[in-house]
Swiss-Prot record:
Pfam hit, one: ABC_tran
PROSITE patterns xref list: ABC_TRANSPORTER_1, ABC_TRANSPORTER_2, PHNC
UniProt-annotated location(s): Cell inner membrane
Entry-linked SUPFAM superfamilies: P-loop containing nucleoside triphosphate hydrolases (SSF52540)
Protein name, as recorded: Phosphonates import ATP-binding protein PhnC
Binding sites annotated in the UniProt record for ATP: G37, P38, S39, G40, S41, G42, K43, S44
Top EC group: translocase
Length: 262
């Protein structure tokens, strides 16, 4: 099976606090993987490294590869980082949309990387690009809102627009950082259904950070759980049982309680 994401010996330190400890990880084509862990476990930090939003420590041998291209090596971004980012869709917890633009215009932003510079200066998109944007909105059930200002949408609707933008980008990998953290249960279900649909029907690799273990078990075949910057579990979601759950979360709570008591 083709390896889409390769992480070797990744470490990250923030102000003398080590957030990641020599993490190794391989993710294969077509997988839908959940990154789990308590707050501060390093899951979002790991995800941001995958597309080079942040760089790791200058550790000997550290290396991140995405879609066959080096993203960063020993704390330095690759010079051609834009080439790997061009096919990587990143979905943020806070949507990262332009509120003053319409839904359709926000989705068209996904085409900027493949659009000649002079056309981007005038926000000129071809009829074919606009048609593809409408098709992407149809896929996520948002085509009827195409000409509505994005600021008028609910959080769940905005998150689906962000997914449509990734489809417009023709992403081969989608990295979703807590995409349902601020959503009500029904909106969260729709967003996760949408991510699973494009994973299963388009073959797009999806890596998603989640706090909700039940969603990880329901939607992702593989779980990578982090605990204090270490990979605690990496395997089939069906084998992530109550004992592992308790050890991952309750032991962290005891550490926090002891620290407060001290």
């Amino acid at each position: 099976m083709q390896t889409i994401i390769r992480v070797e010996k990744l470490a990250k330190t923030f102000n003398q606090h080590q957030a990641l400890h020599a993490v190794d990880l391989n993710i294969h084509h077509g997988e839908m993987v959940a990154l789990l862990g308590p707050s501060g476990s390093g899951k979002s930090t790991l995800l941001r490294h995958l597309s080079g939003l942040i760089t790791g420590d200058k550790s000997v041998g550290s290396h991140i590869e995405l879609l066959g291209r080096t993203v960063q090596r020993e704390g330095r971004l690759a010079r051609d980082i834009r080439k790997s980012r061009a096919h990587t869709g990143y979905i943020f917890q806070q949507f990262n949309l332009v509120n003053r633009l319409s839904v359709l215009e926000n989705v068209l932003i996904g085409a900027l990387g493949s659009t000649p510079f002079w056309r981007t200066c005038f926000s000129y998109f071809t009829r074919e690009q606009k048609q593809r944007a409408l098709q992407a909105l149809t896929r996520v059930g948002m085509v009827h809102f195409a000409h509505q200002r994005v600021s008028t949408l609910s959080g769940g609707q905005q998150q689906r627009v962000a997914i449509a933008r990734a489809l417009m980008q023709q992403a081969k990998v989608i990295l979703a950082d807590e995409p349902i953290a601020s959503l009500d249960p029904e909106s969260a279900r729709i967003v996760m259904d949408t991510l699973r649909d494009i994973n299963q029907n388009d073959g797009i690799t999806v890596v998603v950070t989640l706090h909700q273990v039940d969603y990880a078990l329901r939607y992702c075949e593989r779980i990578v759980a982090l605990r204090q910057g270490h990979v605690f579990y990496d395997g089939c979601s069906q084998l992530f049982d109550n004992e592992r759950f308790d050890h991952l979360y309750r032991s962290i709570n005891r550490v926090e309680e002891n620290a407060k008591a001290a």
